[in-house]
């Protein structure tokens, strides 16, 4: 536990050093960095205190339940104090690091994008704009693929999504989600439960939290994800 805390705090110190260096020359532009949902190694509630806006990279696997992605969006909203967050990265097509890097189905990226907005995202962004020519990310999806044209299905779908977001999104930017139910997600518990000897080495903390979240998601119940000792948990009856 001591090492886990040290690791998270040390990397946070690296981020704040870089942030402060930028602040010497730019006092107004919001500063953030890419978070990764339920990533184990960093206590994101502590990180969010040092970020002007929370942003994260959403890369669900081919077998990731939509409810788990929804939980991650709500977690990112929760660590930022229920404020709108940024969907910093998603791919308009395939990822390049999964065991099976499937091509997104027609309309899939639209569903994922609006899911993010529905859970509090004020931005929908992509990585990457133009497909890399070298390195492993030459296999990663992009708005503009290796053919360099606007004729691909992916480009046309992404462009249509952009027009849709521009038309509708302006009406809902900055809006807040009101929830009457809260679920605690605590990195200290995450580390201790998965690091202890017994009762099982197969315990997966995010999956256990998701079991409760999924039951609410299936009933269309909005959920706030909160930390231990959350100051405003009295606002939620459950």
Where does each model-flagged region fall?
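Conserved, well-ordered alpha-helix/loop/beta-strand core segments that scaffold catalytic motifs
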Residues: 5-35
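Carbohydrate-binding surfaces of carbohydrate-active enzymes
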Residues: 28, 37, 48, 52, ...
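Conserved N-terminal glycine/acidic-rich loop preference
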Residues: 1, 8-15, 40-53
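Short glycine/proline- and acidic residue-enriched helix-loop micro-motifs
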Residues: 1-6, 144-148
């Amino acid at each position: 536990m001591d090492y886990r805390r040290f690791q998270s705090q040390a990397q946070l110190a690296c981020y704040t050093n870089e942030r402060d260096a930028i602040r010497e020359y730019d006092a107004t532009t919001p500063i953030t960095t890419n978070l990764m949902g339920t990533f184990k190694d960093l206590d994101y509630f502590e990180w969010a205190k040092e970020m002007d806006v929370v942003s994260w990279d959403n890369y669900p696997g081919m077998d990731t339940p939509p409810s788990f992605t929804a939980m991650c969006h709500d977690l990112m909203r929760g660590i930022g104090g229920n404020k709108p967050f940024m969907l910093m990265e998603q791919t308009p097509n395939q990822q390049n690091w999964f065991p099976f890097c499937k091509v997104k189905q027609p309309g899939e990226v639209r569903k994922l994008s609006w899911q993010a907005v529905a859970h509090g995202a004020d931005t929908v962004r992509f990585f990457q704009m133009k497909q890399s020519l070298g390195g492993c990310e030459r296999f990663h999806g992009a708005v503009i693929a290796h053919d360099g044209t606007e004729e691909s299905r992916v480009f046309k779908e992404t462009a249509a999504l952009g027009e849709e977001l521009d038309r509708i999104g302006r009406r809902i930017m900055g809006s807040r989600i009101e929830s009457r139910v809260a679920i605690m997600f605590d990195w200290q518990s995450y580390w201790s439960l998965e690091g202890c000897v017994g009762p099982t080495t197969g315990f997966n903390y995010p999956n256990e939290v998701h079991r409760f979240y999924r039951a609410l998601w299936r009933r269309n119940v909005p959920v706030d994800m909160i930390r231990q000792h959350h100051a405003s948990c009295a606002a939620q009856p459950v």
